[in-house]
Amino acid sequence: MAEPLKKPEPPEPARDTHLIGTPFRRVDGRAKVTGTTKFADDLAFARMVYVRLVRSTVPHALIRGIDLSEAEKVDGVLGFLTGKDVPIPFGILPVSQDEHALCPDKVRFAGDPVVAVAAVTEDAAYEAAWKVKVDYEPLATISGIEEALATPEPRIQDHGDHGNVHKQVSMTFGDVEKGLAEADEIFEDVFFYEGNTHLPMEQHATVAVPEDDDRVTVYSSTQTPHYLHRALTKVLEIPASRVRVVACSNGGGFGGKSDPFNHEIVAAKMALKLGRPVKITLTREEVFYCHRGRHPVLMQMTTGIKKDGGRVSITAQRLRTALDGGAYGSYGVASTYYTGALQTVTYKMPAYEFQGVRTFTNKPPCGPKRGHGTPQPRFGFEVHLDKIAVKLGINPADLRLGMLAEPDSVTANWLRIGTMGLKRCIEAVVAGSGFRERWGKLPEGRGLGLACGSYLCGAGLPIYWNHMPQSGVQLKLDRSGCVAVFCGEAEIGQGSDSVLAAVVAEVLGIALADIRLCVADTDLTPVDLGSYSSRVTLMMGNAALQAAERARDLIAQAVSQQLEIPQSRLVFAERRVFDAADPDKGLSFQDAVIAAEARFGTLGTTGSYIPPRSPGRYRGAGVGPSPAYSYSASVVEVEVDPATGLWNPVHVWIAHDVGKCINPVLVMGQVEGGVYMGLGEVMMEEQVFRRLPRHLSGALVHKFPSVLEYKSPTFEDMPPMTTYLIEEPDPQGPFGAKEVGQGPLLPVMPAVANAIWDAVGVRVDQVPIHPHMILKGLQAKAQGAPARFGPKAFPEIDFGETLLVPTPDEGGDGTAINDYREKLRSGMRSSAGTMMTREEALQKKRLAALTTDLKGA
């Protein structure tokens, strides 16, 4: 029987803050706006050489030979690398170690790297790269999901569940068939979400510098220095102590720099080979090839609805997803699970079935992009709900408000919800936009759409399961009154450096100017797993909070003794430590540190963070759990020209449950940035591939490998926006804070689709929404057919054996009743890979630092 969920107690009573919750300048703001920030491509070292990668010109082929003879004649060429020089595979997930720094014998997409050329100048490297000749033996090319399902041979990868299916998932929570049978009405829809790329302002760049004793330092525009360090150590076959990774400031990442990449490993290998610094900066075209962008996903959604007077509830839902994963694994196993995992955290759903499949195709590999795996099903779900509301004659806002998931509850698929501000988010955007009064009543061509969303505040488990902290922070206090803060977090433009500094400054009562940051350096900083899954504020923030509170306690002991004041009366504020009862009695923070050092010696403290254990213990439950979930709601107003199908957003209202604002200005920037990215995806952005006609070879080609042709919105395309920051402090977050980097994007795309329906009565069930789609819907409407544009059917797919997991309401314990394979696994983790506590592991006489293999997960 599942234990009833108890609301976690706050670590201490709510307290007044001085810096937290107020607008303040970013700690890196001046450097960013004056151009003095050093990005990876800005770095230069003596005797530095340049490397270009020779990439495959065909999408699928065996490598029969490489001719370097003409390239070797180019003046300034220093050396080459091929696949035989870096034979060890790598990948971000333990279960998908399927990439090579350079392809040894086979290319899997147009753009796969084959040869690296080093030269003293960039021009020489380019010229030599063009003169490398590669002899290919073409193989059959697989272009999409249905083709991959129907074509098991030739296999693109040797691993995966079968044929060209990388991963298949099937799990049922509760009695879905019974729930559908009890429904008054059953609704079913099919949706498609096209893939797209991250398009950060900064292209990927890396500089590798060889040092004494066969050491190498890699400076890179990475979001995950810890995982890059791991990959370099593996592929280069040198001890971890010989590899240093420094994550430079990123000019945007959005998930696109969270894998270890070929060019990073090639740069390090070439630097060690030549004994000289090596720089690789990708062109924008190359970024399109290695991007790891959003998966194209085809979805089928079936929902049972019960009507009880004016109240509507979901009885059960079945979701099926099919992902086009491209040529490599990347984060794909996790991506597959994410298309179904978070479906249950917004609305009550007593029974839920999720089936998903990820296929390999001969395209650049897909991975995590802002919202990782969740924008696609969220688009489908919110449009699906809008159709239900219209069919039942209910205002879409009332439909959602009547079926919200409960705070402090456990979902059917065993996700633990804490605080939940979605009700307030909906109420804010509905009131601000006049949705109740205006929806369905605007002139033809003008419409309003509402949608909601939710996202993680950090993944509950690390990529490599272990008992160690997911984030660590170390403080060094010196006699000047300054505090040095060391942390492995990566600043990718989201303001994490400012959050780190603010948490420490708040606890110690000092100014941001008194903080010195050393971040994202694997030689100097404690491990932080990186900037992904919206984990940084909550996880790094909690580690920083713990380290700062430990430092405060040491200082308080010394000041209490010196001033003969109880520690409980000491206040840390305004660069002083003073008596709350007599503020004139106290010490400057500098003198307080000196007193503490005199008593305790050199001052340094550490903090770390490990997420709470998830109640789910079935195979696959490792994807979805989070210490907390953020919530968002959006209303979008659009105008549509029925004659052309052209549409434009007129205004966006967005509300986000942020828990507690660390810095409202930073939060607003993240919310509005997410909205703009969402508008780009629904308006125009798509990573599209097309087959050439057979008489032109039938090859699979990239349609938009440039910013000019890919199309992304500019300032001219963006509408006015009204933003509401909803604060419901969550006890799991530092000062109650939750994520803000990814969640606000999720409701934007479905809100637009719903607004277009309100404007012209056409349902476009796919993203992006192009004018011709609206026109075709209008033409169908005029002919008396359904006014819809989108996929017509979901293919028949064998998803394999279904895991049967009883829900909390059914008295389940978080395990699957038929997961015999997992029941045989004992050891460090539960059946889901959810970690035991350290104490449990030690009781079993196992090493707390031992990591477990994801093989077969």
Language model regions located:
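Flexible, low-hydrophobicity surface segments
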Residues: M1-V165, I186, G460, G856-A857
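Glycine-rich loop/linker segments at domain edges
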Residues: T22, D28-A31, G163-T206, P296-V383, ...
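Extended active-site and interfacial segments that coordinate phosphate-rich ligands
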Residues: V27-A31, W130-S143, Q223-P225, R230, ...
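Short beta-strand elements
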Residues: A31, T37, A205-P210, L298-K307, ...
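C-terminal catalytic domains of large/alpha subunits in multi-subunit enzymes
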Residues: V74, G83-K84, E237-R242, L272-I280, ...
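Short acidic, glycine/serine/threonine-rich loops at helix termini
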Residues: F90-V95, A128-K131, S220, H229-A231, ...
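Helix-loop-helix junctions that connect adjacent transmembrane helices in secondary transporters/permeases
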Residues: P152-L236, M403-C482, R617, L696-Y724, ...
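Thiamine diphosphate
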Residues: R244, S249, G253-G275, K279-L282, ...
